[in-house]
Amino acid sequence: MAYSYSEKKRIRKSFGKRPQVLNVPYLLTIQLDSYEKFIQRDSDGQQGLEAAFRSVFPIVSNNGSTELQYVSYELGEPVFDVRECQIRGTTYAAPLRVKLRLVTFDREAAAGTVKDIKEQNVYMGEIPLMTDNGTFVINGTERVIVSQLHRSPGVFFDSDKGKTHSSGKVLYNARIIPYRGSWLDFEFDPKDNLYARIDRRRKLPATIILRALGYTTEEILSMFFDKVNFEIQDNKLLMTLVPERLRGETAAFDIEANGKVYVERGRRITARHIRTLEKDEIKQIEVPVEYIVGKVAAKDYVDLSTGELVCPANMEISMEMLAKLSQAGYKEIEVLFTNDLDHGPYISETLRVDPTYDRLSALVEIYRMMRPGEPPTKEAAEALFDNMFFSADRYDLSAVGRMKFNRSLNLEEGVGSGILSNDDITGVMKKLIEIRNGRGEVDDIDHLGNRRIRSVGEMAENQFRIGLVRVERAVRERLSLGDLDGITPQDLINAKPISAAVKEFFGSSQLSQFMDQNNPLSEVTHKRRISALGPGGLTRERAGFEVRDVHTTHYGRLCPIETPEGPNIGLINSLSVYARTNNYGFLETPFRKVVNGQVTEDIEYLSAIEEGNYVIAQANSNLDENFRFTDTYVTCRGEHGESGLYKPEDIHYMDISTQQVVSVAAALIPFLEHDDANRALMGANMQRQAVPTLRADKPLVGTGMEKPIALDSGVAIVAKRGGIVQRVDASRIVVKVNEDETIPGEAGIDIYNLIKYTRSNQNTCINQIPCVNLGEPVARGEILADGPSTDLGELALGQNIRVAFMPWNGYNFEDSMLVSERVVQEDRFTTIHIQELSCVARDTKLGAEEITADIPNVGESALSKLDESGIVYVGAEVKGGDILVGKVTPKGETQLTPEEKLLRAIFGEKASDVKDSSLRVPNGTSGTVIDVQVFTRDGVEKDKRALEIEEMQLKEAKKDLTEELEILEAGLFTRVRNLLIEGGVSEAELDKVAREKWLEQTLDDEAKQNQLEQLAEQHEELRKEFERKLEIKRNKIIQGDDLAPGVLKVVKVYLAVRRQIQPGDKMAGRHGNKGVISKINPVEDMPYDENGQPVEIVLNPLGVPSRMNIGQILETHLGLAAKGIGDQINAMIKQQQSVAKLREYIQKAYDLGHGSQSVDLSTFTDEEVMRLAENLRKGLPLATPVFDGAHESEIKGLLELGDLPTSGQITLFDGRTGEKFERPVTVGYMYMLKLNHLVDDKMHARSTGSYSLVTQQPLGGKAQFGGQRFGEMEVWALEAYGAAYTLQEMLTVKSDDVNGRTKMYKNIVDGTHQMEPGMPESFNVLLKEIRALGIDMELDEE
């Protein structure tokens, strides 16, 4: 393949055997697309804001005389951009304005005559906007809305699997779940009666629902049963015969016809008997009269002469009844066909327990169940039932629900509306009875065809609709009050409920989460997370094993590896690499179509529902050059996800890629196929906790997923359009755009501003560094600047470290690690952490708090780092306890001592009416102040420091805009110059005149003259735009800040802390191999090889076999080979060997193995080869894709090429004695991460601190400055040693003996070291609790 200029800087050699059919899709699609659909005006109004408005409007007054109609909406421009919102602590949102029309009808005139129309734009609150990276800025912090996996609307058939009843009988049930509205359940009880529940309330016989729908007993029976006809002829009883119905029964009498006995009495009726009966076309047989006894009448029988009801429908027929019927003149009797095998009498039985007799009684019964205690009226009962399932306002199945419903009941897909029909309800009951009769299957609720994804847009729309409905109620009430003469839509609408609903969702919903911003991977993963928790989802406590387990339909949709350990395991999942949601919200994954054993280029996305019908081959099936399967039998997933062997011609689809199964984080683990799943899970989760190091270092052994993740995460800067780098410094990059990519009439300059040293949500440091040089060509979509944890546009979470697997004096016992001092000296794992501390000055009852350097009772030295406004200088190095912002709070009048009275009398001032409430550096933190921001409320005078900061910001803004103008003007004048030269003006003439005068030239060619005039206009426009932008910037900087009520000033101080690695820090590899640093060892004591090169980390080999993560060993070997090749290249450069030799050697490295990648260095210029070699000096980056990685032979080949032992083991010497270790040791390069569990954040000690109110025991935890818990096991330990006094001290004076501890303090101060233990407070608590039970318990103190 052809590489672009910047791709040629460093090419990662890939071992992937299969060419990439489909590029990795944009990883944040699920977030961006979903919200885009919400915000956009949809033409059909099926989703988003438009749909919400259309579903609520028009709002008609109760008397129908006025209505408020919705016309359209528009979103304004946000006031501040994303960056400004973060600094100011506001929400990045756009105002929503809706055009509404108030129509008044003339009530006297004919219906529909309009009397008056008022149209107006109404403000309806603010809608938060999504940033380009799929996040929201809410109150200044970046948040992510996690997608939810919930049960799809539709109908589900399920069983209790025999767990409910003691007999173990399986009870079946059906549940209709709408998108919004009441749930309707049908269920069998152990006696086989069918019951219904509405909204999971108490159950009613299901036939009540049918009666409420208006069906009579006769209609109900005819809907659910087949009939059998009996004829009475000359005292004989003849039965109409349907032979098929007799299958499996035992003949209770001889079955004979036309004198031939077909089945003798007591014999079982078989298929042969049925065939003979059918062949002889027997339509009727004679049966004994007793046979009809116990059968059930299918309809009402009325004595036609008297009109009296002889036998009601659903009545069992007895001999007397038979006599009555024949007396009444009935020659034919219809009964229900039932049997024990597959036609149960369930509905008939249920009708017998049903207390109702007609529609009204059924409606009343339902009303009583839904609204117990209210007196039912006919109207109320009807309205309640109608509103429940048949009103579009209250009930909506949604398109998805209707689709699932129709599929389940085998109806046509597109038919039906969002509400239920009579046929829908009877259809569900029929199917449930079929399942009870043994025909049909119950649904699997964990199947991904029955669970769908609800993304940001949909959830925001639901919240918005809730807000609108609240507004609707208020508007309807207001419209019904009458007196609408001078009223406008603006007066009717109160935007508060809407903005409150939206705000609540974005600010405090369970699915709106504080973005995990440790590193680019954690951001991407967080946005691709799928949670089963949240509103309308599951709860941790109720979720069983089945829901959490991996399901066959997860294949290619949800990752089977990446999920948290702990109570949320399996409830929070991650989207697989290629997965996406379809229009209905179901997850789908791509496959290549296979036709007659030939794999085509066509790619189709299948959802879990569709996938079940096809045979699908795996991505690593063997194909020949014509894309035909080479094996006679291919391993495939067949129907129902079961694996099996199939012939090539039976295959329908083939997987797209080997990494289709896993998520983004799991796809970053090289040799994943050699790791145990549990360890891979830890590896995937721990990569998200890696802290960005000071100098990012790309992994030598990667998987090829590093580039897409770094690009899509949005932390790096990507070129919007191709061009040439015109200027570059640490804070901005200017690109002159290629002619063919510019829009006619623009300057053709792109300016990219870099983010410098800002704080992330996790207090890590975000900083962007340019990685292009002046004059370099860049193409669209290429990387211009690296962000945190990226290296030349590749994700770089850790460092490549030389490791050895060997024990070393117990320092790597139980997963600890021995680290060389060199790692610390070279700052390999040094990280920068930025903390934000803020000081708020409020208006209190006693007066305003003041930020000042004049603090009572504080020495000069403590104020040395503050300026005259009382705010710390930027650049000051501070440690725990130092004052950052001086602040005093007025305190109430206290009783004055005589001395103070004297002072007041002399100096006549209030010397002590304020107390010190300054912002200090928390204990245990130290660092450098890198930034200070002051926010002042409108109308409060700004202090000197605030004015200085303002001035500086104005200068910066002006400088930025001036530079931007200069760059744009330069671009413009280049075009003017070229135009003039083409138009016949000589260069010498142009150079004599000032640039501005060029625009006044006149040219002979009219077209060129027009162009010149256009350019002059553009220049004028540029100037105006500059002035406009400057003015906007100025206003933004100068205007007062919008602070919380009662707040006058906020000062934010940013501290940067540089943390080197130290014992107690947690580190990990990518294979779940985590550990804690036990010791930093001097370089000279570390084991070294024959060349004197020491290893950097010593790991314990015993951590590998039992954990079964062999991937780390293979990574180590391959890392050694990569480094070996880098060393060879380095040596060649140092020896100044010819470019041809370098080219040949590098080409050899790229050609090694059987990968599908081809790199042809002969197309590179010498300069490009040299630059590539320069970038490969530290090692040749390799990619071993998941499930398609390097083979052992390839690793050995690379080791040979790097002139290293193919065993991957090296003889090492002990650094302290110089002796050789007794056997070769596995040495190589492993990619190690430093995790965000730093010992500095966990170390904590307490001397005196706060106590719990009730128990009077010290609080727990570092945040509360708590003590160490002395639990029951610790008590046992002291008891075991008989340390009675120590134990007494622990349980009394060191804990909750209030008097004892004060005395103890006094004794220590007095120098008498004695302890007087008293009564622990927790004993008193126990006393009180016993008294609370009503038992009077006294303590007799002797």
Curated annotation (Swiss-Prot):
GO cellular component, as recorded: DNA-directed RNA polymerase complex
Enzyme class: transferase
CDD domains: RNA_pol_B_RPB2
GO molecular function ontology, one term from the record: DNA binding
Catalytic activity line of the entry: RNA(n) + a ribonucleoside 5'-triphosphate = RNA(n+1) + diphosphate
UniProt keyword list: DNA-directed RNA polymerase, Nucleotidyltransferase, Transcription, Transferase
InterPro entries: DNA-dir_RNA_pol_bsu_ext_1_sf (IPR042107), DNA-dir_RNA_pol_bsu_external_1 (IPR019462), DNA-dir_RNA_pol_su2 (IPR015712), DNA-dir_RNAP_su2_dom (IPR007120), DNA-dir_RNAP_su2_hyb_sf (IPR037033), RNA_pol_bsu_bac (IPR010243), RNA_pol_bsu_CS (IPR007121), RNA_pol_bsu_protrusion (IPR007644)
Presence of keyword Nucleotidyltransferase: yes
EC number: 2.7.7.6
PROSITE patterns with a match to the protein in the record: RNA_POL_BETA
Any one GO biological process: DNA-templated transcription
Domain of life from the UniProt record: Bacteria
Subunit structure: The RNAP catalytic core consists of 2 alpha, 1 beta, 1 beta' and 1 omega subunit. When a sigma factor is associated with the core the holoenzyme is formed, which can initiate transcription.
Function: DNA-dependent RNA polymerase catalyzes the transcription of DNA into RNA using the four ribonucleoside triphosphates as substrates.
Classification via PANTHER family: DNA-DIRECTED RNA POLYMERASE I SUBUNIT 2
Similarity-based family: Belongs to the RNA polymerase beta chain family.
HAMAP family found in the cross-reference section: RNApol_bact_RpoB (MF_01321)
Name of the protein this chain belongs to: DNA-directed RNA polymerase subunit beta
Gene expressing this chain: rpoB
